[in-house]
Amino acid sequence: MRNQEIIRKAEMSLSALKSGGLMNPAQASAFIRMVQNTPTIFSESRVIQMENDSQKFEKIGFGQRILRAAQEGKALSNDELTVPTTSTVQLNTKEVIAEINITYDTLENNIEKDGLQQTIMQILAERAAVDIEELIVNGDTASADPYLAQLDGIRKQAVSHIVDMNGEELSRATFKKGLKAVPPKYLRIPQEFRFYTSHGLEVEWKDRVADRQTNLGDQAVQGGLSTAFGVPVKGVSNIQPYTVGEGDAQYDASDIILTHPKNIILGFSRNIRIEVDKDIRSRKFIIVLTAKLDSKFEEEDACAKLINVKE
């Protein structure tokens, strides 16, 4: 296929991605699924496709015992009746924008597979997912970084159960303190929770597990998923270490967040816009993606944050 034919086919494929710049519902849903399927924290979290830029989600739960001793022929008294506790999660999306460049060479390598549109969408999703994860994890409205200042991420939102490790090295006791910090009522199935931390601390824990002369040690060396008290320990690329102290007392530390993956809600507005331009001098297509999103804990009380864990 000649170069001009490739470019014409690429232009047709790119134009099919948009409708006045706005993705149609099917395209938006497909793109959101691609973002969710990337190897980020979203792959396990609860992703909600929002119809509007602002939306409330109801939470219903029973925070106390609902069963009573049954007495034949006698109904429960009024003070024995249980009323569900209700509250809402409010998501208010913030707009984010991304620009990627796809060169003609990239197109030439993919054009004859009859999957160019899918390839472009996949490239967009993979590149956007990492940046979205950075915002959802490290967002801080007090940040000097305009991108991160758009919203408070999960590290900032986790405030109810904070454990300061004061520079202690990672050990089994570290994870034990995290588990004991979360109210027991949430830990009915602890295996479904996750310890999210930096890749450095994940490697440190795998190294400690590998020292054991057991099958778990062998699995850790071979790259298997490590656990602590039955809870998987997962490294997240956007949980980065930070420096604590000064001079000789200075050290690198990181955080560990313990929560259920589905407790992290990522709200994605379906109003996703994609615009395309062509730079003939640089031989590339310029694709600009605009999306709106927000993230919250469904139950902030159901998570713990360990800070100042020595790397």
Swiss-Prot record:
CC terms in the record's Gene Ontology section: extracellular region
Keywords: Secreted, Signal
Signal peptide (residue range): 1-9
Subcellular location as annotated: Secreted
Domain of life: Bacteria
Function: Possibly a prophage capsid protein.
Recorded family membership: Belongs to the encapsulin family. Family 3 subfamily.
Protein name per Swiss-Prot or TrEMBL: Putative prophage capsid protein XkdG
Native source organism of the sequence: Bacillus subtilis (strain 168)
